[in-house]
């Protein structure tokens, strides 16, 4: 039996089991199963270290345990070390290894949904300075973005993010300086939960963005956030956040089962149907 799980608190909302079990069935991997494992914060570190004893060959890690997983594991890939956060755990000959595929998922989604997109085209503007912003900023820099501009209500938090990641060309802006931040940018990314169902919307005038700019959002419920709708109506190219979820799952599945799965229209339709969307 090859068992893998997603660890979180809560974890009932996770669509990782739907994604991975779809791929397991598609590729005919016998004896494999992917399940949810709800783990409270005070038990997370011990559970993560004892994954093998619980019968798991690997795991995904979701909020609020990504930083706990990093601290609990002795081995990490280079990206997890830089981010100090783990979303994928793999069994290696040397033991459990923590990895982070969030940035990979973000970049792969843009390349998939916006063919021809190039990070080198110009500055990238990030709204927010939380955990998702860390992964996305690092990935964009690695992809060749010439400048990372971070807009955050608390500039000191954005400055700490840039310093901690060692970003080479980062600029920080307060909320009131958004017009300057957007001037000449090639990409705008909402890395916050603003715009998600039950949350307030992103309050931002995007008109200073040049016409060729791409606008994307990590939120995928709703699939088209108010930010994306406004951008689309203003003539900008847009990419929704669902693909980031789908693409970040690819490297882990390959590491666990030895097969590299594809993010297809069928998989996207399956997840959208589960979300009550079409």
Swiss-Prot record:
Binding site for NADP(+): 128-132, 152-157, 218, 241
GO BP term (any one): aromatic amino acid family biosynthetic process
Pathway in which this enzyme or protein is active: Metabolic intermediate biosynthesis; chorismate biosynthesis; chorismate from D-erythrose 4-phosphate and phosphoenolpyruvate: step 4/7
Active site: residue positions: 66 (proton acceptor)
Annotated binding of shikimate, by residue: 14-16, 62, 87, 102, 220
Keywords linked to the UniProt accession: Amino-acid biosynthesis, Aromatic amino acid biosynthesis, NADP, Oxidoreductase
EC number assigned by the record: 1.1.1.25
GO terms, molecular function: NADP binding; shikimate 3-dehydrogenase (NADP+) activity
Catalytic activity: shikimate + NADP(+) = 3-dehydroshikimate + NADPH + H(+)
InterPro entries in the record: Aminoacid_DH-like_N_sf (IPR046346), NAD(P)-bd_dom_sf (IPR036291), SDH_C (IPR041121), Shikimate_DH (IPR011342), Shikimate_DH-bd_N (IPR013708), Shikimate_DH_fam (IPR022893), Shikm_DH/Glu-tRNA_Rdtase (IPR006151)
One annotated Gene Ontology cellular component of this protein: cytosol
Domain of life: Bacteria
SUBUNIT field: Homodimer.
Family according to the record: Belongs to the shikimate dehydrogenase family.
Job description of the protein: Involved in the biosynthesis of the chorismate, which leads to the biosynthesis of aromatic amino acids. Catalyzes the reversible NADPH linked reduction of 3-dehydroshikimate (DHSA) to yield shikimate (SA).
Identification of the protein by name: Shikimate dehydrogenase (NADP(+))
Gene that produces this protein: aroE
